[in-house]
Amino acid sequence: MKSAARILAVGLVLAALAIPQSGMAGGNGTAAFEQLKSLVGHWETDKSNMNKATLDLELTSGGTAVLEKFRMVEDGKPVEMITLYYLDGDQIKLTHYCMAGNQPTMHGTYAPESKTLKFELESITNLKSADTGHMHHATYTFIDNDHFKTTWTFRKEQKDAFTEDVTYVRAK
């Protein structure tokens, strides 16, 4: 009888651990997705920290995804990348289609009190080796309705190589 009670107790503990708890990382994905949806429109860099670039965000796939299109010219050549933001259950995620030729997928944690959305690498496709360069982290800071900042961290040779901080202004 004691072993049956012990098995039942262990089963209840395991079941409790399997149930998502409110307030855990990623449990606020819906709020983060709503914040990203508020960015739909045309944006330009504030030009204080990089070449002029544009960012277009659009709601797609029946409202289930936000598609971001980044465009700029560097050394006379066009630079274009896209990032797709979406929910997986109540977890906000992104997949970034990078000029580096790989596609990192990241999961995010939203902190409404600081207006920040932080993404961490979850998986990546087309990565030739662990030393190959790729985007590894991203942070969005929502300043107001017409301004937001992104910070992307590029990792190469298994260490952070550089960070790009860009502030965007909504084009009117």
Residue ranges, per PLM feature:
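Hydrophobic small-molecule pocket/channel-lining residues, especially in calycin-type beta-barrels
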Residues: G23-K172
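Bacterial N-terminal signal peptides
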Residues: A9-I19
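Bacterial N-terminal signal peptides that target proteins for export
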Residues: M1-A9
